Amino acid sequence: MSNVVFMVNIKNENVPTRVVPYEYSINSWRKWCDKNDCQLFVLDEYIFDSDYLRPNWYKLYVFDLLENSGIDYDQILVADCDTVVHPDCPNFFELSENKFCAVHNDGSYDWVCRSYENYSKHLFEGFEFSIWEYFNSGFLIMNKNHKQFYQNIIKFYFENRDLIVNLQDTFGVGTDQPVINFFVHKEDVELKLLPYRFNMQDMFRKEILHDDMLFTKIGWVYHFNAIPNNVDSQLTTYWMKKTYEYFHGGKND
């Protein structure tokens, strides 16, 4: 039995350039897993028609996918493919206390508040929780105790799919992230928030995403999201490639 890092990397034929940089993410996590005696699992195939269920929701099937693949696991990290991990990142599984772990979403608060307010009003009957406990879904640690919890979210999604899709299209809000947040707080799942350095989102806005690689000096997991003027994911590719090669040399293997 081992800890698992789970990622979803599915090529969208309509936006083929989007996945180009993700190999740098996967390879960085593969090296980290080898160093820390963990297993990497990358889902690269559709399990639903994309018009019915977008791939970012596939993360909810992590337990079923691992078990159907015959993988016996202890804890799981579900990580987004636009992250690169520092090779010396501490083993965060040892910090979990067997709780559901995440990192506060410290990025665009307009987007966070818009997601929070509209999901609360239109989907969760006015339920509220502290905005400072609203987390980013790009780095989530869980274990077998959370399997039924995820099954509940899946059931809820399909019962409310049309409303959820309409909320996303109408208000430009998050997809799986707000729903997971509301479920964690509504069902009183024991949550441990880890420091920002384990999911460094929105680095451009924090003025640390520069060629001096300052961001690599202050944290462990670099999340290359919310980069402005990012046409065809060119800047995502630039930064993920540069970061990977900064740690591992010029060969992406």
Identify the function of each model-found stretch:
Residues 117-131:
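Short, flexible, basic/aromatic active-site loop/helix in glycosyltransferases
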Residues 132-234:
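Catalytic core and acceptor-binding pocket of nucleotide-sugar-dependent glycosyltransferases
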Residues 1-72, 226-228, 238-253:
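N-terminal anchoring/stem segment of glycosyltransferases
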